[in-house]
From Swiss-Prot:
Involved in the modulation of the specificity of the ClpAP-mediated ATP-dependent protein degradation. HAMAP family: ClpS. NCBIfam families: PRK00033.1-5. It comes from Neisseria gonorrhoeae (strain ATCC 700825 / FA 1090). Signal peptide: none annotated. The gene is clpS. This is ATP-dependent Clp protease adapter protein ClpS. One of its GO terms (biological process) is protein catabolic process. Belongs to the ClpS family. Gene3D superfamilies: 3.30.1390.10. Binds to the N-terminal domain of the chaperone ClpA.
Length: 104
């Protein structure tokens, strides 16, 4: 009986650990292209990602100079929603802006 209790305790401990792990985080990135205006990128960053003007400009410059810029990190569902919002807005306004989600 002692062995069964130990095995149950180990199982409960493992389950507790699994249930308390923080959710994976995902980065939402904008990718550079030759057509989307810098102003539109800043708009996206301030309106969808709620960045302040100064931070939005810094991310936009990363996109422009490094080819990719991190807009924020979120749980998977929120990251995918942000990505969809960016893609829908870009398409609606005629910009080829691309947005990707990567596990951090």
């Amino acid at each position: 009986m002692g062995h069964a209790m130990t095995a149950q305790h180990q199982s409960d401990t493992l389950l507790h650990r699994l249930n308390t792990l923080p959710p994976k985080r995902y980065g939402v990135f904008l990718l550079n292209d030759d057509y989307t205006t810098m102003e539109f990128v800043v708009e996206i960053l301030t309106e969808i990602f709620m960045l302040g003007q100064e931070q939005a400009v810094a991310v936009m410059l990363s996109v422009h100079h490094e080819g990719k810029g991190l807009c924020g990190t979120y749980t998977r569902d929120i990251a995918q929603t942000k990505q969809q919002q960016v893609m829908q807005r870009a398409k609606a306004e005629g910009h080829p802006l691309q947005c990707i989600v990567e596990e951090i």
